[in-house]
Amino acid sequence: MPIIADFDDLAPAELLLVLSLSRKTGRVTAVRGDQKIVLTLRNGSIVYAASPAIRERLGDILVKRGAISEHNLQRALDRQGLLLEPKVLGTILVELGLVSTAVVHQAVFSQFEAVIRQLLTWDRGELNFQSSEVPDVGAYLIDPVELLVVIGYDGLGPLVKGLVRLALKRPAAKTA
């Protein structure tokens, strides 16, 4: 089920909430001029968020916060490069006992939050959602509803606020 809409017809927050509530899997692309933001969702949770304007990677965030050393980051990256099956860095760091799942989840959350904050500042643009397979590579699942609550949704319309309230009442999705 592809969705293509201008921001005038469907706000990014509204699309995220609909995709979250309906537990959709696929890719959201938001474009404004030459700027592009990409989000990947699996069962309604964000597993990937990227923007050329926000380049801070997970390992760098964890080093900056003092959660891991540069040496241990490199150790995990080296191991990741040797794996035959893809696996996200956060999972490798946890498996090596270098950091807790909670610390990685918190860092991934802040990484995705920065991308969503940027998207919510756009006043115009086009949204495109395409259903697609998203392999489970051990990614951390971030609930878009939780992100919108943390960011604050005072400026959003009544439909979005109602959807957020509804989404907060549903059972939580399992996280990796």
Identify the function of each model-found stretch:
Residues 1-176:
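Acidic, Ser/Thr/Pro-enriched low-complexity segments and adjacent helix/loop capping patches
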